[in-house]
Amino acid sequence: YVSGSKGATLVTHAESVALIKKHGRKATPELKTYTPAAGMPTYDTIRAKVVKEYTDAGFSAANVWLQSFNYPDVAYWVKNSGDFGKQAVFLDGNYTDGTTVGMDESVPSKPIGIPNFVAYNAAGFNYIAPPMQMLLKNDNGKLAVSDYAKAAKAAGMHIITWTLERSGPLAK
């Protein structure tokens, strides 16, 4: 929060990467949706710059999981970023219960229920990251592995998740 902090400045992504490296940490940067305007860098330039800033700081790809909800971001990294692409994480914004089967084939980044993990894997995607409710189900009062998680593992996908999805005020 800069507005309320007199004299404060935001760090650049490269400065943030240098701090992470200095403290011996691993990184999971998320590339947000970017809409370039006239005179702004292209989307591919931004995708490449993220990787370059980690390599310039001396990061091994083994310590960086690039992530995005945007299918083309992950596809770009897989195709153009060597070992960094092998660890790129496709964030699944699907918020069903992990049992509904189907996929909007016209929009591969918008799965409905259980995505086509075999196709993701064939495209070079190795990591999927859905919200927690996609990985677990209630099986007669007992916690069980969801169909989504079983399908992802069967296709050879690595799974990373987050524990809290918050789309509105916490008071709700």
What kind of feature is each model-predicted range?
Residues 1-75, 79, 83-96, 123, ...:
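Metal-dependent phosphodiesterase/phospholipase catalytic core, i.e.
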Residues 38, 44, 87-172:
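C-terminal active-site rim and adjoining tail of enzyme catalytic domains
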